[in-house]
Amino acid sequence: MKRPHIVFLDAHTLNPGDLDWKCIKDLGEFTAYERTERENIISRSIEADIIITNKTVLRREHFEKLPKLRLICVAATGFDVIDVAAAREFGIPVCNCAGYGTRAVAQMVVAHLLEVANRVGHYTAACHSGFWSQQNDFCSWNNPLMELQDKKMGVIGFGNIGREVINLLRPFGMLLFAVTSK
């Protein structure tokens, strides 16, 4: 059986330099491009059986010129960068990484909430500038902290990420609710 030719059009989006791509190389002939400009998509993918993309947009005009293409893998949770209807017309399945990053995104939401409540960045800058040590009593409350307990917070969307945000915030004693269109 012929090993597939796999092309990753924008590998920099997943690899800050710490991946060797071995697991993909084991599957077939693999080429990873850091970035691919729109005008280079066809030339870089002409022999591809499989394209992996994260942000590089693929449309009908590409599928028309890539007769060997058998699969598109989106290295993200969504696949809005792909003209899925056109891919379907050409018999090209599109898959994504559903559930990828749920914990990391929820953690970032909580980090931003804690920044709003505690102003960590503000106090870090104040410490670096010497503000704290210049106070007569070596105490600085130039911005009050917000305690999260008993504060109300609504989460818009109750999918995987919304549920995880609520799970992470429960220990703070907040009054949490979710709003969803479903």
Task: Name the predicted role of every residue range.
Residues D80-I92:
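Rossmann-fold NAD(P)-binding glycine/threonine-rich loop
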Residues F90, A98-K152:
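Phosphate-binding beta-alpha-beta segment of Rossmann-like dinucleotide-binding domains, i.e.
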Residues C139-K182:
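Rossmann-like dinucleotide/phosphate-binding beta-alpha-beta segment
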